């Protein structure tokens, strides 16, 4: 297997000669000069064992949804069934960057083209300078990864058809809905709270005026007016 954590969105030559390179040629386009992310990914993927190779690469989220050349490469990888799992990690867990990152797991010779999405962006404890993923957080991700089951607000197995419907865009919120419904307070409760507040303000105002009146009658300054 291959594990990679390359420099994010680094520059590279993207020289047209690379289109003849077997690492890149099957995917129709080269990674853009300003973002070598897919060049690293394809380099690692090329070196996987043909029968059962597995690779995990850490990259910025942009690789999941950016268009143009990167969109073409992503589509080719998805058509091939190469992308097995996409895991969204919390922001600020690495020393060298605070941006949220994603782990993409690729496999050679898969028999299907579905993609398992895990949104682990909230799986961390707050540390002094950065966020920390504990063994418990990592275990939760691994359990989900092994099961490939639907987990509310955490994981979703997207069929290839669903990915095509989303134009090969792998942005995690398209597949894992983490929206928390805010509890809606009944209007009658809101009105009664407002009434109570108004009454409290009225009574406080009355008390204040009364105190001012007492002051007015007792201070020497008031008498001198």
Predicted segments with their positions:
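A conserved structural/catalytic subdomain of Rossmann-like adenosyl-cofactor enzymes
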Residues: 1-225
